[in-house]
Amino acid sequence: MIKTVKSKRTSMSNTKLEYSDSWDHLKPLRILVAVFLLNIAIYPAFSDDSSFRSDLASDYTEFVYWLKKASDEKKIPGAAVAIVSREEVKYLQTWGIRENNTSKLVTPESIFRIASMSKTFAGTSAAMLVERDLQSWDVKLTDIFPSLILGNRTSSRKITLRHIASQSTGLMPHSYSNLLDDGVVYGKIKQKFHEIPTVCAPGKCYGYQNVVFSLIGDIVEESTGETYGNFVDQEIFKPLGMTTATVGLDAFERESNVTTPHRLVRGNWRSTTNNPAYYSVAPASGVNASILDMAIWVRANLGAFPDIMSPAFLSTVHEPVIKTPHGNYFNRWANLDDAYYGLGWRIFDYDGMQVVHHGGGVRGFRSEMAFVPELNIGMVLLFNAASTLANDVVPQFLDNLNK
């Protein structure tokens, strides 16, 4: 049922994973179990082999070759990448180590912090509340939390769930992210929401948020009576079969197969500590996951599991809401035309393709994922190092699709 093709090189193995059409009726958990049973044979880690060769299908050979070579040049400690379609995992590979100066290899089950890619789960959670008539996109935040003040009182009374999820609250961008950097947790920062400067009317301009965006967690808890982490686990992770995915620092620290964050110190990657404050804004930055589970997540957003996320549901979540200005790294990609934020996702036009995307970065970790619904193809990358190389991964992948 599953075919594997291995490299003939003795120093390193690559594998292309293929599922036959007869597996289409299986639930994602059963597919994942099958992958787990075969992962030792299917997904061995790369060695430090500068003469990397791939037996991938030609569509991805050049991209994967570039990625491995660039990662070697940057001496990235550990990484994982997957290329998927709606129907299958086309390619999945890990390489390197979970922590510098150890022999602990990154495996397909190794868990990374995915940082701001967590926002895609928050947008989906908000959409589930709306789909179940527990909330509406146009509900005012002050109707849910009467004492809440976000910025000035006039604008605060107009901010909706849609504005929160689409980063269009009109509040100063990155409000209080500096406090997260300093280790101040969400519960304390919320007390200062009324002090946030308002820069435009809600819905009129883009302003990326971590702290304010995390009000989605409060809304989930108020609407369902469940903690945000439990809701995501029960309504997203478990139904999709994402068995290594968790929310929060405690869950991360309970696992043994986790990756360690790394930062550059005088040109060398050194292990560092996790910043617990960013876990306190769980909707913005609190998800942990392996490459196996992130491959499932991209497939789900390509429409692999319509009984969980229907085409209409995905269309809503991936719909552009507010245009994003130039200035961020993704806006400087050469072939990018227009860029928007949707409901927890970025959407942009790239060389004639509509791409759905999000990246992530938190102390010692970088991540990127992007997919093209029209071409039924997507990619996700996880680094246990805060490397700027991640900035180039999505355009390299997309440029390769057009060759």
Question: What do these predicted ranges mean?
Answer:
Residues 187-199, 265-280:
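The feature captures the short pre-catalytic strand/loop hairpin that immediately precedes
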Residues 160, 211-212:
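Mid-domain, small-residue-enriched loop/turn segments at the edges of structured enzyme/sensor domains
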Residues 120-125, 214-215, 291-296:
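Short amphipathic alpha-helical face segments that pack within enzyme cores
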